[in-house]
Amino acid sequence: MKCPFCGHPDSRVLDSRPTLDGTAIRRRRECIECGARFTTYERYELLPIIVVKKDGRRETFDRSKLLNGVLKACEKRPISYETLEKLVEEVELALQKQGSTEIPSKLIGELVMSKLRQIDQVAYVRFASVYKDFREIDQFLDIVRELKKDQEVD
């Protein structure tokens, strides 16, 4: 595999193991030219998912775009990259299980928010503020009150 650091076309596999959920193979690699180490994931390929946006536009589901959005919400939070990878994997599998190739973006956002809420409440609020397009401080207060209310019930 091509090295992402120096571009050399060859690397060797140092370690190979399945991910915890068994849906991918994680490989630790080393470039034979520059010695840099990097990780790759091998996943099965399923039917392409088309995301139907709020305005009706359609675009191919982009796993990395979803992961980047989740990473942004979790910035400077004590959440491992592996946890976020797993979250994205679970969302993608849930979308595949829908049985439809066209999925509304609203469903994706709701799935992510549901999972983030269980992982980290600050990340949940951050993601929700972008996803729901908060424009007023009261919207933040409402979601925080909702979280506090849920904590009192538990």
Swiss-Prot record:
Recorded GO MF terms: ATP binding; DNA binding; zinc ion binding
Entry annotated with the keyword Transcription: yes
Residue ranges annotated for the ATP-cone domain, each copy included: 49-139
Residue ranges covered by zinc fingers (unnamed): 3-34
Cofactor (UniProt): Zn(2+)
Cofactor remark: Binds 1 zinc ion.
Superkingdom of origin: Bacteria
Protein family membership: Belongs to the NrdR family.
Protein role: Negatively regulates transcription of bacterial ribonucleotide reductase nrd genes and operons by binding to NrdR-boxes.
NCBIfam families membership: transcriptional regulator NrdR
PANTHER family for this protein: TRANSCRIPTIONAL REPRESSOR NRDR
Protein name, per record: Transcriptional repressor NrdR
Gene field: nrdR
